[in-house]
Amino acid sequence: ESRCWIDFNFYGHQIVAHLATDEFKNLQTNFVDGEQISCRHFGVILGWKEWEGLSKKLNRLNVNYLITPRIRFENKVGEQGTFFIEDPSGNVLEFKAFKNDSDVFKKF
């Protein structure tokens, strides 16, 4: 950690954020289940109850979502709760939980 970068504890994982002189804007997106998803994002998979609790907490804090908490691929393989937020440096973060943990890497 220094004046130019910081490490964040991200559910036991490390996100390293560096200051940059150029801004990263107009990121490319892809269409997924009715939403435009940032191609460049970091995701974490939580347990279903943990995801529900976090989304409720962030709602109470009036967090600005890029994509609000929702269920994606409902009643299909890969059913998941998901939401996207942006950190102060513009990094896109996805928080998700799968209805069935065995679906995490299944194609859907």
Where are the model-predicted features located?
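Non-catalytic surface loops within mature trypsin-like serine protease
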Residues: 12, 21, 46-48, 87-89, ...
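A short, polar/proline- and glycine-enriched secondary-structure boundary/capping micro-motif
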Residues: 26-30, 104-107
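Short, structured secondary-structure boundary patches
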Residues: 18-23, 37-38, 84-91
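Vicinal oxygen chelate
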Residues: 6-9, 29-108
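Short, surface-exposed, polar/charged, turn-prone segments marking secondary-structure boundaries
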Residues: 26-28, 35-37, 43-47, 66, ...
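Core segments of cupin and vicinal oxygen chelate
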Residues: 1-24
